[in-house]
From Swiss-Prot:
Entry keywords, A to Z: Nucleus
Species, as recorded: Arabidopsis thaliana
Single GO cellular component term: DRM complex
Protein's name according to its UniProt entry: Protein ALWAYS EARLY 1
Alphabetized CDD domains for the sequence: SANT (cd00167)
Gene: ALY1
Length: 971
């Protein structure tokens, strides 16, 4: 087996004796170090010496001999160097930063610190001598008569050298644990040893000592090393004893006549029987009450209370407690115990561990009477917790169960009740309810005690709740019995609840008052009338608008002045959608969104620069509109532009922002200036308001004419689209090409090419002949419609962004390219030589109005390009989608049936012609770059095999575009 583990605190008390020496040694080392530094520094430096030292140091830096000679007054080189080492950091600063005054202040502070440390060292030495002298003291040993009950305390080292500490330790029997260096030196109360000493000490001396200790603790304001110890002795039990003792001494001036008998009873105890804990469980509070009364007898102080009736009642209680066994039975009755527990309901926070063990020995001396009592109540007794409802037929509880229940973690006082008549049981439950009500009102203890009469018989009961209040101080008679019908509805017996906190009570009261006010509000006659939906919404809106933040948000969201409304009503994105005929579309496809994004370009980042630019634009717009309004007022024949709102005039009703409160108010315009106007508010008088803070009362009347027409047009388009919408289509809203054709654009785009229209139709026909699946046919039609819409959208976007001159170049180039490709295809299909083919191309160009002859090198190059693209795209005939790549078979002679990519050839020729046209004349670089983007988009092939060539073309065009954009001026 492993050896027995030894206690770690065997020799702990010797460490306390050695610790002062260690502290003294460390203090002495610090003192020696300071003395050594002071010796090097020499005598205290005067101000003149410091001034001379500073001047010499600035003059002879590092030459300490010259500095010492300049200082004079027998200052050695070592002293001067020591002074420099002490203030090295300060003296190293530049001459403008450091000064003589700073050096003098630092040395003055140094000397003051040295003086303070020396005075503290002297006090420390004196305390060490006192501690060593008092260390040899030992507490007085108790007489031999007490050694059987009291464990001899350990020898405790004196803390801070106070003899009264040892006296208090011996008197109240506090044991100090063996502690280490860092353990706080305050005493811990030992309950059972304290009670043993109190049992064998006279009650009058013990009470006087306790009162003296309490008085000293109350008078001591702080700073004493024993404050924590004295505060630990002031437990709730002792405070309760002291207050009750003072109260009892005034009520019983002649209580000294009982002192001898009480002292005899205390001295007759001897060795206490530990089995008295069982009786304490049965009559715990009765025993506690008896001890409180005896402490009250031993007191000699008087209180200020002059309640004579209360004094007589307390005297009756004391006489009942000293009565023989005849009255002991009535004291142990459940009714009397319930009264005791109710009187001390606010003092029951202590558990059984805090109850003194002297209560056990106090009842042990009356063993004969207790045995008789146990035999008398063994048959009908019952025991139950207070939370369990009381039953009439009680069961007998064994002694083992009582002991087991007393060993709980947080035990409660459990009383062995005696079966009483029905009236007593009901009275007890009624009195419990009454006590709970009184306790919740926080009434004084003596008021509750004065309202309760002693129960001298088992059939004693109280009358009504009103007769037992604090104001009514009558003693209820023994014959007053409460009828059974009055207390039948009182329910089971419950423990009175803890009094609530006053702060929570005030909070509950305030909440109750608010609830009452709400009830009063709802109890008005209008609350019975059911509000309509309109009135309910109006009330909610009024409540919402009562918040300032909501009103500010409404101003930012909906308040627009007459001068700013056209500017903010114009949205570039909405204008673009209306221009291409998609302003009425609630949803767009992915292809449409991609086209829109590519057309609008890259958006600007939301930054401070962007916001500042927008503000500058708005300010310029405002100034231009104000200038136009001023000219319009000066000239009677002036015409208002269709994109401007009608200006405000005198007498118009407006909604204006008050310049002081920044709240919206109704008003009327009195005068109009360039950018301000005088507004007469309905309730706030006349104020000068900016024109941007005035909104017409009816904004529709001041709307610009152009904006009004645009809104009407959008509404008409939306109405038409709503009528033409297919009811069964739940996917993306698709519009037929007729909708796009009916839209009147400002710039007429070129009609869709024949290949673009023919290609989806042919693709649908091929799929319809190869399969009979109806869903595939529908999908092909949908795809064709989307492609057609996308092409029209591209042409529209190009026409919108480019200048008219650039648009003419694009149209002319594509027309020439289409004629050349058609002539070349016809010539190739006819099988004639190169000269005949060239003649056919010239004829085609002359037919479309082209008067410039082409070089001979152009046509062979075009023809070579045609056959090259044809040979490249010839491999795509065997793919899964041959018709989707834009191939159209040219039916000529039966020998040559090679399909020709006419669309791609036309785009290439048109691109070449565009580049040739813009090179003949100088155009703006931005327009040229935009035209090149159009060329690159037109060259995009549909065959995947041509994508590498397209990437090369795209790269080359990007380089050219970058060089052109470098010529664009940026402001």
């Amino acid at each position: 087996m492993a050896p027995t583990r030894k206690s770690k605190s065997v020799n702990k008390r010797f460490t306390n004796e050695a610790s002062p020496d260690i502290n003294f040694g460390s203090a002495s080392k610090t003192k020696q170090r300071k003395k050594k530094l002071a010796d090097k520094l020499g005598p205290q430096w005067t101000k003149r010496e410091l001034v001379r030292f500073y001047d010499a140091y600035r003059k002879y830096v590092g030459d300490w001999k010259k500095v010492a000679a300049a200082v004079r007054n027998n200052r050695s080189v070592e002293m001067v160097e020591t002074l420099f080492c002490m203030n090295r950091a300060y003296l190293s600063l530049p001459e403008g930063t450091a000064s003589v005054a700073g050096l003098i202040a630092m040395m003055t502070d140094h000397y003051s610190v040295m003086e303070g440390s020396e005075s503290e060292g002297e006090d420390h030495d004196a305390s060490e001598v006192t501690r060593k002298h008092l260390k040899r003291k030992r507490p007085q040993v108790l007489p031999s008569d007490f050694r059987e009950e009291v464990v001899p305390p350990h020898s405790v080292a004196s803390v801070e050298g106070c003899l009264s500490f040892l006296k208090q330790t011996q008197a109240y029997e506090k044991r100090q644990r063996a502690t280490g260096k860092r353990t706080p030196r305050f005493l811990v109360a030992i309950t059972h040893e304290r009670d043993d000493i109190e049992d064998f000490s006279p009650p009058n001396k013990r009470a006087k000592k306790q009162l003296d200790a309490d008085d000293d603790a109350s008078r001591r304001g702080g700073g004493s090393p024993y404050r924590r110890k004295e505060l630990s002795e002031i437990t709730p039990t002792r405070l309760r004893k002291t207050s009750q003792a003072q109260e009892a001494q005034f009520k019983h001036p002649d209580s000294s006549m009982f002192e001898n008998g009480v002292r005899d009873r205390w001295h007759k105890k001897g060795a206490a029987d530990r089995d008295g804990a069982l009786l304490m469980d049965m009559e715990g509070l009765v025993t506690q009450k008896e001890k409180i009364v005896r402490v009250e007898e031993a007191e000699g102080n008087y209180s200020d209370d002059d309640d004579g009736l209360g004094a007589l009642k307390t005297l009756a209680e004391m006489s009942a407690s000293l009565a023989p066994a005849g009255l002991l039975e009535s004291e142990s009755s459940p009714h009397w115990e319930e009264e005791r527990k109710t009187n001390n309901v606010d003092k029951k926070s202590n558990t059984l561990e805090t109850v003194s063990t002297s209560h056990h020995r106090e009842k042990a001396k009356q063993a004969g009477l207790e045995d008789n009592l146990l035999h008398a109540i063994s048959a009908p007794d019952k025991r139950k917790p207070k939370s369990v409802p009381e039953s009439v037929d009680g069961n007998v509880v064994s002694i083992e169960e009582l002991r087991t229940s007393s060993r709980k973690r947080k035990p409660k006082f459990q009383v062995l009740d005696v079966v009483a008549p029905k009236e007593s049981t009901q009275d007890k439950s009624l009195y419990t309810k009454e006590s709970a009500e009184v306790d919740s009102l926080k009434t004084p203890v003596k008021a509750r005690r004065s309202s309760q009469g002693p129960a001298k018989q088992l059939k004693t009961a109280k009358t009504t709740v009103e007769s037992s209040s604090a104001s009514d101080k009558k003693i209820t008679g023994p014959d007053a019995v409460v009828p059974a019908t009055q207390v039948s509805a009182s329910g089971p017996e419950t423990l009175p609840q803890k009094p609530p906190n006053r702060r929570k009570i005030s909070l509950k009261k305030s909440l109750q008052e608010r609830a009452k006010s709400l009830e009063t509000t709802h109890d008005k006659p209008r609350s019975f009338k059911k509000l309509s939906e309109h009135e309910l919404l109006q009330e909610k809106l009024s409540n919402c608008l009562s918040y300032p933040l909501v009103r500010r948000w409404c101003i930012y969201e909906w308040f627009y002045s007459a001068i700013d409304y056209p500017w903010f009503a114009k949205m570039e994105f909405t204008d673009y959608l209306n221009h291409v005929g998609l302003g009425h579309a609630p949803r767009l496809t992915r292809v449409e969104w991609s086209v829109i994004k590519s057309s609008l370009g890259r958006p600007r980042r939301l930054s401070q620069r962007f916001l500042q630019d927008e503000r500058d634009k708005l300010q310029e717009y405002r100034e231009s509109v104000r200038k136009h309004y001023t000219e319009l007022r000066g000239c009677a024949t002036g015409v208002l532009h269709t994109d401007l709102a009608r200006p405000l005039s005198v007498g118009n009703r407006v909604i204006a922002i008050h310049p002081k409160t920044r709240e919206i108010r109704d008003g009327k315009i009195l005068t109009v200036d360039h950018n301000k106007c005088n507004v007469l508010f309905d309730e706030l008088g006349v104020e000068l308001v900016m024109d941007i803070d005035c909104m017409p009362l009816n904004p529709l009347e001041y709307m610009p004419e152009g904006l009004r027409r645009q809104i009407d047009k959008c509404l008409a388009i939306c109405k038409e689209a709503r009528l033409n919408r297919h009811p069964s289509s739940d996917a993306s809203v698709l519009f037929s090409p007729s909708v796009l054709e009916n839209v009147n654009f400002s710039m007429n785009p070129p009609p869709a090419k024949q290949d673009d229209i023919r290609e989806p139709v042919l693709y649908g026909k091929v799929i319809a002949t190869n399969t009979t699946d109806q869903s595939i046919v529908i999908n092909s039609k949908v795809t064709g419609t989307e492609i057609q819409r996308t092409l029209a959208l591209q042409h529209t976007s190009d026409a919108q962004e480019m200048e008219p001159e650039m648009i003419e170049i694009v149209i002319e180039s594509k027309s020439i390219a289409q004629a050349m490709v058609d002539a070349a295809i016809k010539a190739a299909s006819s099988g004639k030589n190169n000269e005949d083919s060239e003649n056919m191309v010239h004829q085609a160009l002359s037919s479309i109005g082209e008067h410039q002859p082409l070089d001979n090198s152009i046509v062979p190059g075009i023809k070579h390009q045609e056959y090259t693209n044809g040979s490249l795209d010839h491999h795509s005939l065997n793919t899964a989608e041959p018709m989707s790549n834009g191939f159209i078979s040219q039916e000529g002679s039966g020998k040559n049936k090679t399909p020709m990519p006419s669309e791609l050839i036309t785009s290439c020729v048109a691109s070449w012609l565009m580049m040739q046209m813009i090179s003949k004349k100088q155009y703006p670089p931005a327009d040229v770059a935009q035209l090149m983007d159009t060329v690159v988009n037109d060259l995009q092939p549909r065959c995947p095999q041509n994508m590498p060539i397209y990437r090369e073309i795209q790269t080359c065009m990007g380089l050219i575009k970058t060089q052109i954009m470098a010529l664009v001026r940026t402001s």
